[in-house]
C-alpha cells in the first residue's frame, strides 16, 4: 500500500515534466550494483556533458552530467570534471547561468512587468468607469441652461432652455429639454408667440452700436431672471443670425457680429466668439426639423417611428426638411444619428420666400408694371402706387428693400426705397399677385418660365420634392392665429378668412384684431401661404399639420449643444460598443473579473501570494535530518514527510562531506549521500536522492557511466558547507589512484 502510494506520487510528478527535461537517472537501491554485462544504457547514466541534468544547480552535487569517464591508465582527470563552469554548474553555492537562450529569471521579470502594467491600466479604467457611473447617479438632478438668440429679419428673440439627463428606457435620446419661455404671457400688443423679443432686426442696425445695445440688454436681463444665479457662469449663450443678416454685405455683417460679441462679453453668461455667427439656411432647416421631431416624441423613438417633415416659414426665407428614404448625394442631403437610429434628411432653404420678402416682391412686381416712372419721385420718396392686397382707405409709406435693384436712380436709403402704398382691394388680382410671388421664374433671372400647374414652381432644379407628413410652423402658425383658425382648419378656410379681411375698410380691419405689426399685409399673406403650399411645393391639405408657436429651430440648437456637453461631463446611461449597448453594471462586472484573472496570472508568474496561500512543499528529507533512514523511522528511502519551516538549529548541508571517517576525506568504506533539501524544487521540479556505498567503489567504464560495489564497508558521508569544490575533486582523484 505504501509503495503503491509512492508510485502514484512519482507518476503524477513525472507527468508534469517536459519530455525533453526528464531525468535519465533511474532509481537504484543503496548498495546495489548493476548486473554484470549490463550495457551502458542500462547502467546509472547521468547524461552527457552538453545535456542539462534534472538536478537543481547549487544543491549538493548539482549536476552529475558534468562527470566524464576517468581513464585509470592515463591517471588524468578531465578538466571538465573539476571545473563545471562551461556547463553552468558548480559545486559552489552560486547558481549557474543558463547556457543557451534567455535567462528564465529575466523572462519572468519581463512577463511580470507587462502584467503589472496591464493591471494598473485595467485598474485605472475601472476606477474611471465606476467614478463616472457614481457621478452620473449623484447628478440626476443636475441641469444645464442654454440661452439662444434668434436674430431674424423682423427682430431678435431670446429663448432659455433647461437640459437634464433622460433615464427613460423607451427612447435612445439621452436629453430632456424644458423651455423656460413657456410661462411668459403675451403682451397686449397681440403677439402670436410666448417669447421675449426686441425690434428691429440686426440688419436694420448697421453702424448703430447704441441700437444694438438697446436690442440686446433687455434680452440678457430677462434671461438672468429665468436662470438660477449660481448657474449663470455655466450657462452657454448662442447668438445665431439668419436670413436678415445673411443678405447684408460681408463688411456690414462682420461689423454687426463683432459689436454683438463685445456687448455679450460683459454678460454673466458664458459666450464664445465662435458662438456668435450667421447660420446657413440648411443649418436653420436642420435645427428646425430636430426641434419639431423632439417635441412630437419621434426623435430617437424605440422602435423607430416615421418622422414629420418641417416647413419653417420666416420673414425672409422658407426652410424645408424631411426624411428621405432615397439617399441622394447633393447639397441638400444630411445624415443624423440619434443613438442607434439613423435618419437620412433632405434639407434646404428657399431664400426670398419668407412672409416679408414675399410682400416686398409683390411691390417690386407692381413697380415694374408702372409706366413712365418718374425717377425724381423715387429719389424724393414721392412715388405713389396702388396695391390690390391692401384694405380700402389704407395709405402709408413702405420701405422696399428690393426695389433699388429694379429701378435705377431710385432713392436708396439705409433700408431701401421709400414708396407710398395706397389700398385698392381686389381679391382676384391679389390672389394672382400672390401666385406670382411664389413662381420663382417670375422674379428670378431664369431664362425659361415655370408652369406651376405642371411642377412645383418654388423649387430650384435638382431639389427633391417634399413628401410625407409635414408640420407647418412659424409664419404658417402666425397667419392661422391672426385669423383665429384652429390647427384643424383647411387651406380653403384660410382663403375664406383672408377674403373677408380684405373686404373690410382699413379702419375696421385695424381695430378688429389686437395691435400688432404688419396688420395691413395679412390680406396678402392668406392667399400667399396657400399658393406656396399647393403650387410652390405641391403639398396637399392632408399632408399639413399646423404646429404651435413653441416649435422653433432654437430648440434644436439647445438640444444638439446639450447633447455634446452632457455626454462628455455626466456620462450616459449606457455605452455603445460595436453597435451593441452595454449596461454600466455589466461593464464594471466584466472589468472586475478581468482584473481578478490578471492578478491571478501575475501571482502565478511572480509567486507574490502570501505564504499561507501557497501549496505546501514536500521535500524528501527534513532540514535537520542526519541519517539516511526514513524520517518516519522506516528503513526505506521512499518515505516522505511534510516539510516544516521551523528551524531546529541544525543547518542543512549543501556540499558532500565525510562524517565519522578517518582524517582522509575518502576511504574504501565510505559512502556518499546526495540530498536536496532546498526550499525550492530543482529545475525540472523533481526531487532526487541518490546514495552509494562508497566513492571508492565507484567503477567507471569507457563510456563515462559508474556503479557502486556492495562489497565495500559502509561509511556515511554527509555534506557540509565548508567542503569546497577543489577538495571534492581531489578526493575523487585520490580514490581512483588508490584503486590502481
Curated annotation (Swiss-Prot):
EC number per UniProt: 3.6.1.5
Key words of the record: ATP-binding, Calcium, Glycoprotein, Hydrolase, Membrane, Nucleotide-binding, Transmembrane, Transmembrane helix
InterPro entries: GDA1_CD39_NTPase
Binding residues annotated for ATP, in chain numbering: 147-157, 309-319
GO cellular component: a single term: membrane
Cofactor: Ca(2+)
Glycosylation sites (chain numbering): 137, 208, 330, 374, 439, 484
Annotated Low complexity bias: 708-721
Residues forming the catalytic site: 284
Tissue: Detected in mature pollen grains. Also expressed in more diverse tissues such as roots, leaves, stems, pistils and sepals. More particularly expressed in the vascular bundle.
EC class name: hydrolase
Compartments, record wording: Membrane
Topological domains, Cytoplasmic: 1-113, 603-740
Biological process per Gene Ontology, one example term: anther dehiscence
Membrane topology: Multi-pass membrane protein
Main function: Catalyzes the hydrolysis of phosphoanhydride bonds of nucleoside tri- and di-phosphates. Involved in the regulation of pollen and anther development.
Annotated family: Belongs to the GDA1/CD39 NTPase family.
Protein's UniProt name: Probable apyrase 7
Species assigned in the record: Arabidopsis thaliana
Name of encoding gene: APY7
Amino acid at each position: 500500500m505504501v509503495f503503491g502510494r509512492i508510485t502514484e506520487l512519482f507518476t503524477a510528478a513525472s507527468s508534469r515534466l517536459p519530455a525533453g527535461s526528464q531525468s535519465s537517472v533511474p532509481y537504484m537501491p543503496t548498495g546495489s550494483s548493476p548486473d554484470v554485462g549490463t550495457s551502458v544504457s542500462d547502467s546509472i547514466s547521468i547524461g552527457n556533458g552538453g545535456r542539462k541534468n534534472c538536478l537543481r544547480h547549487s544543491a549538493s552535487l548539482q549536476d552529475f552530467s558534468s562527470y566524464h569517464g576517468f581513464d585509470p591508465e592515463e591517471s588524468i582527470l578531465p578538466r571538465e570534471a573539476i571545473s563545471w563552469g562551461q556547463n553552468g554548474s558548480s559545486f559552489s553555492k552560486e547558481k549557474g547561468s543558463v547556457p543557451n537562450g534567455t535567462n528564465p529569471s529575466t523572462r519572468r521579470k519581463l512577463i511580470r512587468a507587462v502584467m503589472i502594467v496591464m493591471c494598473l491600466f485595467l485598474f485605472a479604467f475601472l476606477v474611471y468607469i465606476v467614478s463616472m457611473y457614481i457621478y452620473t447617479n449623484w447628478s440626476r438632478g443636475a441641469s444645464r441652461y442654454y440661452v439662444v438668440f434668434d436674430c431674424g429679419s423682423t427682430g431678435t428673440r431670446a429663448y432659455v432652455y433647461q437640459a437634464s439627463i433622460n433615464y427613460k428606457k423607451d427612447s435612445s435620446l439621452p436629453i430632456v429639454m424644458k423651455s423656460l419661455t413657456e410661462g411668459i404671457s403675451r403682451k397686449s400688443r397681440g403677439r402670436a408667440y410666448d417669447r421675449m423679443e426686441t425690434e428691429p432686426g440686426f440688419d436694420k442696425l448697421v453702424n448703430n452700436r447704441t441700437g444694438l445695445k438697446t436690442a440686446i440688454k433687455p434680452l440678457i436681463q430677462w434671461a438672468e431672471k429665468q436662470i438660477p444665479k449660481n448657474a449663470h457662469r455655466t450657462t452657454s449663450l448662442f447668438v445665431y443670425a439668419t436670413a436678415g443678416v445673411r443678405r447684408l454685405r460681408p463688411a456690414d455683417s462682420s461689423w454687426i457680429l463683432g459689436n454683438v460679441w463685445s456687448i455679450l462679453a460683459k454678460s454673466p453668461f458664458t459666450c464664445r466668439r465662435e458662438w456668435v455667427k450667421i447660420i446657413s439656411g440648411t443649418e436653420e432647416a436642420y435645427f428646425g426639423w430636430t426641434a419639431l421631431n423632439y417635441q412630437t416624441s419621434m426623435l430617437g423613438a424605440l422602435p423607430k417611428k416615421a418622422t414629420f417633415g418641417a416647413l419653417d416659414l420666416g420673414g425672409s426665407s422658407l426652410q424645408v426638411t424631411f426624411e428621405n428614404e432615397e439617399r441622394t448625394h447633393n447639397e441638400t442631403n444630411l445624415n443624423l444619428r440619434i443613438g442607434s437610429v439613423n435618419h437620412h434628411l433632405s434639407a434646404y432653404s428657399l431664400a426670398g420666400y419668407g412672409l416679408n420678402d414675399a410682400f416686398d416682391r409683390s411691390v417690386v412686381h407692381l413697380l415694374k408694371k408702372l409706366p413712365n416712372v418718374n425717377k425724381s419721385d423715387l429719389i424724393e420718396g414721392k412715388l405713389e402706387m396702388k396695391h390690390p392686397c391692401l384694405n380700402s382707405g389704407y395709405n402709408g409709406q413702405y420701405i422696399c428693400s428690393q426695389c433699388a435693384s429694379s429701378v435705377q436712380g431710385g432713392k436708396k436709403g439705409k433700408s431701401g426705397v421709400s414708396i407710398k402704398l395706397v389700398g385698392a382691394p381686389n381679391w382676384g388680382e391679389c390672389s394672382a399677385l400672390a401666385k406670382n410671388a411664389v413662381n420663382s421664374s417670375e422674379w428670378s433671372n431664369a431664362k425659361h418660365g415655370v408652369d406651376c400647374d405642371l411642377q412645383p414652381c418654388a423649387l430650384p432644379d435638382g431639389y427633391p420634392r417634399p413628401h410625407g407628413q409635414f408640420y407647418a410652423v412659424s409664419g404658417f402658425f402666425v397667419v392661422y392665429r391672426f385669423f383665429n383658425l384652429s390647427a384643424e382648419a383647411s387651406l380653403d378656410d384660410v382663403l375664406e378668412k383672408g377674403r373677408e379681411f380684405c373686404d373690410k375698410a382699413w379702419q375696421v380691419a385695424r381695430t378688429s384684431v389686437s395691435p400688432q405689426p404688419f396688420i395691413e399685409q395679412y390680406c396678402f399673406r392668406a392667399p400667399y401661404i396657400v399658393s406656396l403650399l399647393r403650387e410652390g411645393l405641391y403639398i396637399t391639405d392632408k399632408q399639413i399639420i399646423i404646429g404651435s408657436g413653441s416649435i422653433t429651430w432654437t430648440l434644436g440648437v439647445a438640444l444638439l449643444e446639450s447633447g455634446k456637453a452632457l455626454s462628455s461631463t455626466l456620462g450616459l446611461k449606457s455605452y455603445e460598443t460595436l453597435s451593441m449597448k452595454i449596461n454600466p453594471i455589466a461593464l464594471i462586472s466584466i472589468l472586475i473579473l478581468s482584473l481578478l484573472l490578471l492578478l491571478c496570472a501575475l501571482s502565478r508568474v511572480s509567486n507574490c501570494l502570501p505564504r499561507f496561500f501557497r501549496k505546501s512543499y514536500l521535500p524528501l528529507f527534513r532540514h535537520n535530518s542526519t541519517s539516511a533512514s526514513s524520517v518516519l523511522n522506516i528503513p526505506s528511502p521512499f518515505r516522505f514527510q511534510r516539510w516544516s519551516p521551523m528551524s531546529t538549529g541544525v543547518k542543512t548541508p549543501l556540499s558532500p562531506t565525510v562524517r565519522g571517517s578517518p582524517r582522509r576525506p575518502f576511504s574504501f568504506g565510505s559512502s556518499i549521500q546526495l540530498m536536496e533539501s532546498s526550499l525550492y524544487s530543482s529545475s525540472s521540479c523533481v526531487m532526487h536522492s541518490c546514495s552509494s556505498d562508497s566513492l571508492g567503489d565507484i567503477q567507471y567504464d569507457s563510456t563515462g557511466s559508474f556503479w557502486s560495489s556492495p562489497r565495500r564497508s559502509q561509511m556515511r558521508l554527509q555534506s557540509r558547507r565548508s567542503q569546497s569544490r577543489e577538495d571534492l575533486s581531489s578526493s575523487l582523484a585520490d580514490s581512483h589512484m588508490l584503486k590502481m
